[in-house]
Amino acid sequence: MSVLRIDHLRHSFGSLIVTNDVSMSIEDGERHVIIGPNGAGKTSLINQIGGQLRPSAGRILLGNTDITGWPPHRISRMGLARTFQRNNLFQNLSVIENLRLAVQARFGNPLNFITPVSRLRNLRNHVEQLMQRVHLDQGLRLVRELSYGEQRQLEVGIALAAEPKLLLLDEPTSGMSPAETGQMINLIANLPRSLSILMIEHDMKVVFSISDRITVLNRGEVLATGTPIEIQTNNRVREVYLGISP
């Protein structure tokens, strides 16, 4: 079953077409990676899926629900969460405090400081589970004291706090050291298959380590979709994206 389906999506900024008749689907539990050269329309595409951009034409289905043009907060309530290329963390709060705010936002009353003991216990358990899931073990550290890679891990944890069925990751390893990249690969690989993932990524080692299927965008259009092996051996992809002549 498709958790996400995109039909003939189109978006333009004036005369500049950034998404041109894009159709694709994400299956339940799939790890689907979007690749393409700079300016291919990758971020514009997931911004339309997440509600940050309104499509000019086409439709987006999350499960059986048409979410085309919905605002981000409404799409989030339907089970979609995402990260961005630039994080939105509270730098002067601790890891635990950032995660706790995200969990409270998911379950309601994020600013209610008079909370029953049982609910506080459940809240603490949720936060601890999220820390384990994203491989963070120093909950009292302030975010500004974390490494760049650790901040990206925390951002994934905050997205997971919403308990989504579809997670959008926008270049999660961008700017990371090799060690940090390896940690992020391990984190994503260990997320449960009950969660579907759509990811933009430029590091081909990461792409081929994680993906079940890959979609290649070029100039706002789908150049190819297939398994990692199919994409690696596609002559058109090798020429346009990988720069290898057939």
Place the predicted regions along the sequence by residue:
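Glycine-rich phosphate-binding loops of nucleotide-dependent enzymes
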Residues: 2-246
